[in-house]
Swiss-Prot record:
Cellular compartments per GO CC: extracellular region
SMART domains: NAT_PEP
Any GO MF annotation of the entry: toxin activity
Localization of this protein: Secreted
Consequence recorded when altering residue 6 to A: 10-fold increase of antiplatelet activity
Record annotation: effect of changing residue 4 to A: 10-fold increase of antiplatelet activity
Result after altering residue 9 to A: Important decrease of antiplatelet activity
Protein name (database record): Lebetin-2-alpha
Biological process according to GO: regulation of blood pressure
Keywords, in A-Z order: Disulfide bond, Hemostasis impairing toxin, Hypotensive agent, Platelet aggregation inhibiting toxin, Secreted, Toxin
Taxonomic placement: Eukaryota, Metazoa, Chordata, Craniata, Vertebrata
């Protein structure tokens, strides 16, 4: 279940439209957020 997006918001936005552009090059995507957590 690591490849599944968070229960908050749709898989298209994950965190929202704020991280949408940041996660693009930051790696904070749906299934990438867990890897970059720490």
């Amino acid at each position: 279940g690591d490849n599944k997006p968070p229960k908050k918001g749709p898989p298209n936005g994950c965190f929202g439209h704020k991280i949408d552009r940041i996660g693009s090059h930051s790696g904070l995507g749906c299934n990438k957020v867990d890897d970059n957590k720490g």
